[in-house]
From Swiss-Prot:
Pathway where it operates: Secondary metabolite metabolism; lignin degradation
Domain of life: Bacteria
Task performed by this protein: Catalyzes the C alpha dehydrogenation of arylglycerol-beta-aryl ether (C alpha alcohol type) (compound IV).
Protein name: C alpha-dehydrogenase
Binding site for NAD(+): 10-34
EC number: 1.-.-.-
Top EC class of this enzyme: oxidoreductase
Organism: Sphingobium sp. (strain NBRC 103272 / SYK-6)
GO process terms (BP): lignin catabolic process
Length: 305
């Protein structure tokens, strides 16, 4: 996607931080912005600020964990703008830090519910509508650098972000034939209010094994206050969308750590000489299955047409 003029952009977590940064950057490039966020006052304020910049904006209060609410939001977008979004940004996210061995079911349900299930809800809601519209489009999910490696202090978060990276890799393969690009942005620290996320935690997920108080929130703020500015991150995301890049990682300081992490994985792969015949048979079987899968799915599409 090179031209953002009159594109309809639906941005979750769009009222602040990385989401609002994208709202401004894509809006100033000509897109019509839908700010979707769980905080009603923040949505109203964000829309007013965008409109003050001359950006066409519409706000929707949305809990991305609520699938029925997501469907209503999609209907509202089509009613307001006359079409499904052509640019979807899954940006909303939460985090909570604590020893992984003390993680409760509620910790998992809330953190994974927002960071993974919220993304799934966005994809299942909008992808069929985007395909049906026949318009070229793009989807970007804001994951995390933490999705590339596990963390003993952010276990559910890293697991959810890892899954979202994998999910976008799959959707990218599947949506290419429809003219819909897919990218995943994996930030390190962002100058945002994600440290305040625990204040939005629903009561039904209230049993936590982590320490969440004013001191812990202040500690997190000390990290994020030095993070990448949201609009700078948004500019990198915009360029990634323009280039149809799969990965968007505008953090030069993380290269060495990623190289070490993935080199350790590569070094763990058995050498070819350890089982050449078995490797040949497995590859041939996989390729044969791939050809058969393509045929079966093609026949299934014809029957469903």
């Amino acid at each position: 996607m090179k031209d953002f003029q009159d594109q309809v952009a639906f941005i979750t977590g769009g009222a602040s931080g990385a989401g609002f940064g994208q709202a401004k950057v894509f809006g100033q490039a000509g897109a019509k912005i839908v700010v979707a966020d769980v905080r009603a006052e923040a949505v109203e304020k964000a829309v007013a600020e965008l409109e003050g910049l001359g950006i066409t904006a519409h706000g929707i209060v949305l809990d991305i964990m609520d699938r029925e609410a997501y469907a209503r939001a999609a209907d509202e977008v089509e009613a307001v703008f006359g079409q499904a979004p052509t640019l979807l940004s899954n940006t909303a996210g939460v985090n909570s830090f604590g020893p992984i061995e003390k993680t409760t079911y509620d910790d998992f349900d809330w953190i994974i519910g927002v960071n993974l299930n919220g993304v799934i809800n966005g994809m299942v809601t909008f992808v069929p509508r985007m395909i049906a519209s026949g318009r070229p489009g793009h989807i970007v999910t804001v994951s995390s650098l933490g999705g590339f490696m596990g963390s003993a202090l952010a276990g559910p978060y890293s697991a959810a972000k890892a899954a979202s990276i994998n999910l976008m890799e799959g959707y990218r393969q599947g949506l290419e034939k429809y003219g819909i690009g897919v990218s995943v942005c994996t930030p390190a620290n962002i100058k945002s209010n994600i440290a305040e996320a625990s204040r939005l935690r629903p009561a039904k997920y209230g049993t936590s094994g982590y320490v969440e108080n004013e001191e812990s929130i202040a500690s997190l703020h000390s990290i994020h206050q030095h993070g990448l500015e949201p609009e700078k991150l948004a500019e990198a995301i915009k360029k990634g969308v323009e280039d149809n890049a799969l990965y968007i990682i505008p953090y030069p300081e993380v290269r060495e750590g990623l190289e070490k992490h993935f080199q350790a994985i590569i070094d763990s792969v058995a050498p070819m000489e350890s089982d050449p015949e078995g490797a040949r048979q497995r590859v041939e079987a996989l390729m044969a299955w791939g050809r058969d899968r393509t045929r079966v799915f093609a026949e299934g599409d014809k029957k469903g047409a």
